[in-house]
């Protein structure tokens, strides 16, 4: 570092910072300039007197609990001049005995903490800053996630405040071996990231690998939270649409994954937890499998797997059979077209693929009061008149309706869109190359799954490849609870 003046320095990153002095005016002059207090209306500083010493309190308007701060300031009013300690550490022990109190000697960490909501107190004669954590964030209440709903089980879900989310997990795992490491990423955002795992159960090499990748992330801000972080810590194979991580907004699912030896990453400002390593079986698995008896849970799991597979293969298989009607057995003759086609089947299917996505986007951006009218217009008016006008055949509408509903049989949007992309590829290959295109499209789709890898470097479809019969049985059949200690083999 290069000295600029006795108390201002240049960091290795090229930014100026200050080592605090025992002169309050010098500290305030530097900080007021660095924080642009003349322009930032929400950066507040108050000059006060503690006994016979001048002091200054910095805080962010909207991030501070007014009642907590008021109690602290009221306590300062009773301090006498003879009772002032000689150093900041003694002052914090004597007059700030409760709460999270820290001491900082330079402006780098102090500014980051201040902008995250921590109040900072400077006292003339002390060369350190006292940080007082009495912050509060604007937050919504804990409620059931809109996407990860269950038929039975807890109704709480993660919110956008990191400490609330860690508390929801800690409430379920009251074990000192539950480790929650705090990391930061983003040169401008300094986003807090919590890495949660069970000591002795999670893979130590994987923990170190993830920690190192997060610490070495070179990004200005995690503007998209988990997705931004995922792309940073797993930069390879972006062209493969199958998700490398499982995302969940349920604390019970996250806690169960931690107990199985997985690692859960929570990002501040995001209500989703990133669970890793995750195979395709982990992503398809849902909480309902364990909130019902083993037989019911097994049925739900197998149904979800079958429906997800059908959502990818149904329309390409039907298109292939329509192009080769001689392959249709007698008992399946009813699947043939009842009316002639005005538009080739492959174009009907592709148009409906994009039309359904358009309706989905419209539903997301439609006010709640208009959602029902939109559904009526889309489902009845457009569907019925599209068939009557000759744009689409009724069979095409039927099979695409099934595929649309089947996409919602599992909770992962990422997996749903990955299967959609594979379905479109198989459709196009089938339309161009007929049976051989159908076979090639299926081979390509399954290669995209087979050659995918988790962040731990293991097979994406373990225990199917490599084959492990006991683990494969657990993936398809829901066994009795509780599970044995240890990881899940990913």
Residue ranges and their predicted role:
Residues 174, 215, 360, 387, ...:
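Short polybasic/polar patches that bind polyanions
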Residues 394-396, 400-490:
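Hydrophobic alpha-helical transmembrane segments of membrane transport and translocation systems
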Residues 272, 278-426:
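Transmembrane alpha-helical segments that form the functional core of multipass membrane systems
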Residues 1-317, 321, 327, 449-490:
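Membrane-embedded alpha-helical signal segments
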